[in-house]
């Protein structure tokens, strides 16, 4: 009886985040599972985009209707966060970031990657790897620096001493905390969702984990929206005129 009671807790103790599948490139080790699943995610996005727009109709239906809805949603998000003057040139970037994170998160929540056997390690959602989320956050940082310098030139750096020069250290620190908060928020939420589902599946394999998985799909979509919204807000802040 005691073994029966203790067994679920021993299974919980064995729940892990997952082992990385490494590729050796010279002296460097690359997380192969991130690249493999990222290619799958990009193939899904490109495939749906191609099929949805290969035979355009004046009255959209089916997949074309869905792709137009997504495009309008991202366009409105960019317009709200960046402003009417600058938003159009940033719709492709925000759309790419949003769709990549969204499909990556859902691939981890819905697809049984652990069932695919590899020589070592296992497949998982790209956003389950801190390297992916940091890379996305750094791309966003580069984007808003580029947006600000492209519009204002070197005057962009005046923001570090506005409205007062003593705020320089705080404004510089803010440029480091933005990518950190973006990357760790996304990584932490996806990691926590996978751990919770893993614990529940080890305790009660049927029925009970399903609502948690559905909740995970919802929070995964929210995380993609939050990341894209904040990316747009940072770009909008960089290009806005300060008087």
Curated annotation (Swiss-Prot):
Membrane-traversing stretches: 32-52, 96-116, 129-149, 195-215, 216-236
Protein name according to UniProt: ATP synthase subunit a, chloroplastic
Topology relative to the membrane: Multi-pass membrane protein
Cystines in this chain: none
Pfam families: ATP-synt_A (PF00119)
NCBIfam families xrefs: ATP_synt_6_or_A (TIGR01131)
Family (UniProt): Belongs to the ATPase A chain family.
Free-text function comment from the UniProt entry: Key component of the proton channel; it plays a direct role in the translocation of protons across the membrane.
UniProt main location, coarse: plastid
GO MF terms, alphabetically ordered: proton-transporting ATP synthase activity, rotational mechanism
Annotated gene: atpI
Organism: Tetradesmus obliquus
A GO CC term assigned to this protein in UniProt: plasma membrane
Location in or out of the cell: Plastid, Chloroplast thylakoid membrane
